[in-house]
């Protein structure tokens, strides 16, 4: 960990803007959730599309972005609702590990299919260690699926060449435990059942591992950013 306060660390969006050329790019955010990254990409001059499998999350994204409701499509990473060679960039931000384990490699192939030659596959994945991970591990231990996501990238098609790899310290905040619980369940509604039995322990770890700061309680968690270019 650095000596910088968690809330002063560059955000994931800051990291992407520093590594990628976004202006004018047709960028696909796979697993876009409530659309925060889609809106950021547009602010950076990109032409973004969000793909999301959860109806409730699509509704949230469209409500937050009423002038661009058509920018959000229902779909999954392993079967993208997009034409061949139609995108300059495909981004999986904290989403590749949510693809079913036996279809992660297919999701990488789908990215290859929709990318133009010279297009980029961009993947941000949380590392399965650290204070933040320990909080969520009780309700949903993602150690294995996060490792499988990296393995799927390592087994990528030969058309992909890795051009950038960076592990960095990340942070995220919640106003309180109730917000954390809501967001975790919004991402995967099946987690509601787990909270019934382990919610008290999740809250204990949240208060133990979190750091009070601007806007609420902050948690630390390292991120691995990998970028690949489609060469053929």
Which residues fall in each region the model found?
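A short SAM/SAH-binding and catalytic strip from SAM-dependent methyltransferases
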Residues: 88-103
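Class I SAM-dependent methyltransferase SAM/SAH-binding core
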Residues: 28, 33-79
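A short glycine-rich, Lys/Arg-flanked "PGG" loop and its adjoining helix->strand segment in the class I
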Residues: 105-117
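Conserved alpha-helix/loop element of class I SAM-dependent methyltransferases that forms part
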Residues: 6-25
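Short alpha-helix
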Residues: 145-159
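Conserved Class I S-adenosyl-L-methionine
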Residues: 159-232
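Conserved class I S-adenosyl-L-methionine
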Residues: 122-147
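A short acidic, Gly/Pro-enriched loop at the edge of an enzyme's catalytic core
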Residues: 78-89
């Amino acid at each position: 960990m650095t000596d910088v306060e968690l809330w002063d660390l560059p955000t994931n969006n800051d990291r992407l803007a520093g590594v990628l050329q976004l202006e004018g790019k047709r960028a696909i955010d796979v697993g876009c959730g409530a659309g925060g990254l889609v809106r950021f990409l547009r602010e950076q001059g990109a032409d973004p599309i969000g793909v999301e499998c959860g109806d409730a999350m699509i509704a949230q994204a469209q409500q937050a972005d009423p002038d661009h409701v058509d920018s959000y499509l229902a779909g999954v990473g392993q079967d993208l609702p997009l034409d061949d060679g139609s995108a300059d960039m495909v981004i999986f931000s904290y989403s590749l590990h949510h693809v079913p384990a036996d279809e992660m490699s297919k999701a990488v192939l789908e990215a290859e299919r929709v990318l133009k030659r010279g297009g980029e596959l961009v993947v941000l994945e949380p590392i399965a260690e650290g204070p933040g991970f320990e909080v969520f591990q009780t309700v949903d231990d993602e150690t294995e699926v996060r490792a499988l996501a990296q393995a799927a990238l390592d087994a990528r098609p030969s058309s992909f060449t890795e051009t950038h790899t960076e592990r960095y310290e990340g942070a995220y905040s919640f106003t309180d435990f109730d917000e954390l619980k809501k967001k975790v369940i919004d991402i995967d509604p099946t987690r509601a059942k787990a909270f019934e039995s382990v919610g008290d322990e999740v809250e204990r770890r949240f208060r133990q591992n979190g750091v009070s700061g601007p806007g609420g309680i902050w948690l630390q968690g390292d991120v691995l950013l990998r970028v690949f270019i489609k060469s053929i």
